[in-house]
Curated annotation (Swiss-Prot):
Channel that opens in response to stretch forces in the membrane lipid bilayer. May participate in the regulation of osmotic pressure changes within the cell. Its main location: membrane. Homopentamer. Pfam families: MscL. This is Large-conductance mechanosensitive channel. It is found in: Cell inner membrane. HAMAP family: MscL (MF_00115). Keywords: Cell inner membrane, Cell membrane, Ion channel, Ion transport, Membrane, Transmembrane, Transmembrane helix, Transport. It comes from Cronobacter sakazakii (strain ATCC BAA-894) (Enterobacter sakazakii). It is a multi-pass membrane protein. Belongs to the MscL family. GO terms for molecular function: mechanosensitive monoatomic ion channel activity. GO terms for cellular component: plasma membrane.
Amino acid sequence: MSFFKEFREFAMRGNVVDLAVGVIIGAAFGKIVSSLVADIIMPPLGLLIGGIDFKQFALTLRPAVGDTPAVIMHYGVFIQNVFDFVIVAFAIFLAIKVINKLHQKKPKEAPGPSKEEVLLTEIRDLLKQQNEHRP
């Protein structure tokens, strides 16, 4: 089998294609969630706590000296990324919960009695009838 034919078969397997689609959709979903957090959630939240832009939260570890730039820890961006993560994790949790519900197997109905059980039941019933009719 040629290398390219083998690769094509590998790439066209259902699970590989599904994974690729999932990665692409996940990347797009990540952008949507980032925009939701940055543009929709954080501005009102910042307004509620005093008109603060979370992106501006930073701690200067060392100020700029001459040509040496300042060393700054931007913890506001980190807070925003934590919000991103929580929303994405919650959405994935909900999606997995729905998928698990859809894939949940319905309990099988109990099978009826086997042929042997039916036959033995009939024999038992016949023996009971015969014993009832005896004096």
